[in-house]
Amino acid sequence: MDQWNRNYRNLPGKKIGVVQGKTPEEIIECYTFMDKHADVDKIAISFDYSLYEQIAPHENKYMSWMLGRAMMLANMSQDIINKNKPHHLLGCGLPQEFALYQDYKWIESVDTSNPIVHGIKGIAYKHYGLQTKESIKLVDLLDVDISNEQLYDINHNINYFRTYVNG
């Protein structure tokens, strides 16, 4: 890692490390490595670790992913998360998950195509969010001609998404 940091530290742009692992111990070990040893500007945490289904078992895997990441972050924020380092959340199981993080000032950014994909598929967010998720990637929808109804749903979803994130 020291050699990698020496060779690539001065490249333009920001460096982001993505936490990997299948157990709480692996996640914590990888997170700690990213925080203390990897010369990264930001730490990213994914939405679909298999671990989440063990942390928060639910018949709906997307609910497990949402609640599992929220529970993991709540536990890690007590004494593991470096609140002085920016964090990024990769994707989401369900978009309303981001409402759970409004007090986590260390989360600097999130990314998801969820509002767009669901709008294209004609699915408008409800006030509570969604209960399921379309499993199609935005890249597979790039050539779709967007109707006025789909555009309305996309904008509707983006507005709801903003309220989940910002309150």
PLM region descriptions:
Residues K36-A38, M72-H88, L94-G167:
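Alpha/beta catalytic cores of nucleotide-metabolism and tRNA/nucleoside-modifying enzymes
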